[in-house]
Amino acid sequence: MGGYPRTVAVRGARRVPAITFHFWAVKILTTAMGEALSDYLVHTIDPYVAVGIGGLGFVVALAIQFAMRRYIAPSYWFAVSMVAVFGTMCADAAHIELRIPYTLSTVICAAGLTGVFAVWYLFERTLSIHSVNTWRREAFYWAAVLATFAMGTAAGDMSAYTMHLGWLASGLMFTVIFAIPMVARRVLGLGEVIAFWFAYIITRPLGASYADWLGVPHSLGGLNFGRGTVAVGLTVAIVVWVTYLAISKIDVEHEGVAQLPVDRSAPAHI
């Protein structure tokens, strides 16, 4: 996605990757892996133990990520992967344990995400991923990421179960929706920040739908490869891709200088 027409340099190492094809590819792989691994753990061991493991992994991954002074591919994508696992568990727990319908949980998660964005913008006056170059901004960023995973999980389950679309049809639908912000940005000039976060949210149900389609039994409309097998395969793919990114540094952008949007006629600009 393109940059802003007006920017100002702000000192501080970028703590997130450049938004390229590699970003979206690995992001979708992590969403699929998070769905498969979460379901595998919850159905294989005690659900409370599984959630505990997911929560511990989430905390450890974020601690490692916040300890980094700049974007490092392995630590960043490890954090995203653990957010994918734990975020899935949180959304599933809301439905299974609290018996919250998928439609309502989607609305609740959307409200939570809106709240995160509102507070983030209130403090930082921007929601741009290009501005994530301080610990506080990164904290808001990860809060938003976790909320997008929870919301995306609920939306994906709603399409598959409540709307009775099934996994493959849901995956195809979300693939089309995922392309909308890119087309809207190129054709209609949709704002970069809105386009980015719209696409980011959709990656969750997109990846999860395909992961479920690959892993669930034939009786549920899947290919029956097994959730564990799918989780392992996706994890291997993520490790290989992230290793390439770490070695090539092809996704490191403007290290040491972050770009913030500037509107000369207004006090702030999203």
How should each PLM-predicted stretch be described?
Residues 1-270:
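Polytopic alpha-helical membrane proteins, predominantly small-molecule transporters/carriers
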